[in-house]
């Protein structure tokens, strides 16, 4: 089973999640639930109180959409997430004691407060939504491999189309390598 946890403005049909899903399907994760949630709040970046409100709203929406999923019927579970979706995925797995693999695309620092045990992460050094140094430190502390892209932003893009495609290709190769290895 694969569950996609998007960001607020980065839906499952955008490149990273679109191709991440295709790579996961290629690796045998054929049952897929793509979450969809919305939040109308403003001024989220750098505003802890607003981010917490957003998290609570989105988490509640995710919980409702996943209500009734019988996780125990699956031998392997994969959570693929982006941005605030990484926090929601980690929190959900923790609350419901779901043993799963995690793919974190541009995680937020709060993601790591849920003591993730199995995963891989990707972040851009010019990501304005993440405390990049804190994310890198937390990822390494929890032994989650993290791949860092020098000039990339929160969409893992640089503004240079060919370079963006190279980054996307590299991210998907690393995603595929992670999924093609036996679970720890």
Residue ranges and their predicted role:
Residues 1-73:
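Serine-hydrolase catalytic machinery in alpha/beta-hydrolase-like enzymes
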Residues 13, 113, 128-134:
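Conserved alpha/beta-hydrolase "acid-adjacent" motif
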Residues 45-46, 152-167:
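Catalytic histidine-centered segment of alpha/beta-hydrolase-like enzymes
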Residues 59-66, 160-184:
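Catalytic active-site module of serine/aspartate enzymes centered on a nucleophile-bearing elbow/loop
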Residues 77-90:
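Gly/Ala-rich beta-loop-alpha elbow adjacent to hydrolase catalytic centers
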Residues 97-109, 117-118:
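A conserved short beta-strand
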Residues 121-123, 127:
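Short beta-strand/loop motif that positions the catalytic acidic residue
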Residues 131-144:
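Conserved loop-alpha-helix segment in the C-terminal half of the alpha/beta-hydrolase fold
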């Amino acid at each position: 089973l694969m569950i996609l946890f998007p960001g607020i403005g980065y839906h499952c049909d955008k490149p990273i999640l679109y191709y991440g899903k295709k790579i996961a399907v290629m690796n045998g994760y054929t049952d897929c639930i793509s979450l969809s949630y919305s939040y109308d709040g403003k001024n989220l970046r750098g505003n802890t109180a607003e981010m917490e409100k957003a998290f609570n709203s989105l988490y509640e929406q995710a919980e409702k959409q996943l209500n009734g999923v019988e996780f125990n019927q699956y031998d392997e579970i994969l959570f693929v997430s982006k941005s605030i979706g990484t926090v929601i995925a980690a929190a959900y797995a923790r609350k419901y004691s779901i043993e799963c693999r995690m793919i974190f695309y541009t995680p937020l620092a709060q993601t790591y407060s849920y003591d993730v045990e199995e995963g891989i992460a990707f972040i851009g050094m010019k990501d304005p939504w993440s405390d990049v140094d804190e994310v890198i430190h937390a990822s390494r502390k929890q032994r989650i491999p993290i791949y860092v892209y020098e000039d990339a932003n929160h969409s893992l893009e640089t503004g240079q189309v060919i370079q963006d495609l190279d980054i996307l290709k590299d991210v998907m190769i690393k995603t595929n390598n992670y999924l093609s290895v036996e679970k720890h």
